[in-house]
Curated annotation (Swiss-Prot):
InterPro entries (UniProt xref): DXP_reductoisomerase, DXP_reductoisomerase_C, DXP_reductoisomerase_N, DXPR_C, DXPR_C_sf, NAD(P)-bd_dom_sf
Protein name as catalogued: 1-deoxy-D-xylulose 5-phosphate reductoisomerase
Organism lineage: Bacteria, Pseudomonadati, Pseudomonadota, Alphaproteobacteria, Rhodobacterales
Catalytic activities: 2-C-methyl-D-erythritol 4-phosphate + NADP(+) = 1-deoxy-D-xylulose 5-phosphate + NADPH + H(+)
Cofactor annotation: Mg(2+); Mn(2+)
GO molecular function: 1-deoxy-D-xylulose-5-phosphate reductoisomerase activity; manganese ion binding; NADPH binding
């Protein structure tokens, strides 16, 4: 029986993964080694019961008594805290879903790779902050990383059986978010509620706002660089409002391979779960006649400066991605709290990158996770200062 673990089980990606696992037979088809979640103890316990999980972990130690009570008598072991999540990744599992949002997902993902696992990677911050270290760890331990972002899953599939030396360009698509047709002035004055209202995808608050600012796409550009190893000038993003084409790969013979799929994360998750084969996934089928037209346009980097900043990071490499991600997370915290404006987020990130770029770690290829965490900490402090100054100017 195949074994699996789901890190970030109660988030949107985790819920979709759980849904697919249950549809494929649940505990009759899979041995669930570990499930982790945050404060939604009730849902974590429901999942653990349904899958007969061996271990359930909450990221918050103060929630551990509630989790212990919810799973009393089930035989499921419980634990709490960041260290417990890291240790859960040391438990052998054939397939591990890494869906913890933010830099917190880096440690368990790295631990899973060190044990030679197949890692379904939905945590984009891992590649952004420590891409070179992550890919090297996978190679050294015979582990496999499967991208779960819809765009990178699309590129992965388009490249199957191809000679990457013949690839001229990789194009990932962006819906453009709720602000794709807004003026710069209107975007500057937007509210949190407006920013989190995504037109195509059903996602959590933070990733929806990242989509509105196109920081999500900026992270994905960096991911593409780190995962597939293509040079920055061969990677681009286009706005595609219909969210049907997820990525395209252009080849040296002039051919352009496009991957089309529904705007449903279960499509990419299902591919990773069924890999190296394919299996049925319960998503809507595309009716091209009904869609009638697909449109594409260049993104406006004045309204969405995150894309420009991503190109700087792709060129610098080293630990610049860790600084970029840390600053983005801090800036997003301040925007959600109402302390800075929407466009201030990019300004905070740009000022943070400038401030930490003189540190020796900034351009260094990391040798260990500790260096990644050190840059993350340094950039978070710098971003807090930059956000504080922005708040004072409002």
């Amino acid at each position: 029986m195949r074994s699996l673990s789901i890190f970030g089980a109660t988030g949107s990606i985790g819920e979709s993964t759980f849904d697919l696992v249950m549809r494929k037979g649940g505990p009759e088809a899979f041995r669930t080694v570990a499930l982790t979640g945050g404060r939604n103890i009730r849902r974590l316990a429901e999942m653990a019961r349904a899958l007969k999980a061996e271990l359930a972990v909450t990221a918050h130690e103060d929630c551990l008594p509630a989790l212990r009570e919810a799973l009393a008598g089930t035989g499921t072991e419980v634990a709490g805290g960041a260290q417990a999540i890291a240790e859960a990744a040391d438990r052998p599992a054939d397939w591990t879903m890494s869906a913890i949002v933010g830099a917190a997902g880096l440690v368990p993902g790295m631990r899973a790779l060190k044990h030679g696992r197949t890692l379904a990677l939905a945590n984009k911050e891992s590649l952004v902050t420590a891409g070179q270290l992550l890919m090297r760890t996978a190679q050294e331990n015979g582990a496999t990383i499967l991208p779960v972002d819809s765009e990178h899953s699309a590129v992965f599939q388009a490249l199957a059986g191809e000679d990457t030396a013949c690839v001229e360009r990789v194009i990932i698509t962006a819906s453009g978010g709720p602000f794709r047709d807004w003026s710069l002035e209107r975007i500057r004055a937007c509210t949190v509620a407006e920013a989190q209202a995504h037109p195509n995808w059903s996602m959590g608050q933070r990733i929806s706002i990242d989509s509105a600012s196109m920081f999500n796409k900026a992270l994905e550009l960096i991911e593409t660089r780190e995962f597939f190893g293509f040079e920055p000038d061969r990677i681009e993003a286009v706005v595609h409002p219909q969210s049907i084409v997820h990525a395209m790969v252009g080849f040296c013979d002039g051919g352009l391979m496009a991957h089309l799929g529904p705007a449903d994360m279960r499509h990419a998750i299902g591919f990773a779960l069924n890999w190296p084969g394919r299996g049925e996934v319960p998503v809507a089928r595309i009716d091209l006649a009904q869609i009638a037209s697909l449109t594409f346009q260049k993104p406006d980097e004045e309204r969405f400066p995150a894309l420009r900043l991503a190109r700087d990071v792709m060129a610098a490499r080293g630990l610049s991605g860790a600084a970029f991600n840390a600053a983005k997370e801090i800036a997003l915290d301040h925007f959600i709290a109402g302390r800075i404006g929407f466009l201030d987020m990019a300004a905070v990130v740009e000022e943070t990158l400038a401030g930490v770029s003189t540190d020796p770690l900034f351009g260094k290829v990391p040798d260990a996770l500790e260096e990644v965490l050190a840059m993350d900490h340094l950039a978070r402090r710098a971003a807090e200062e930059a956000a504080g100054l922005r708040q004072q100017k409002r």
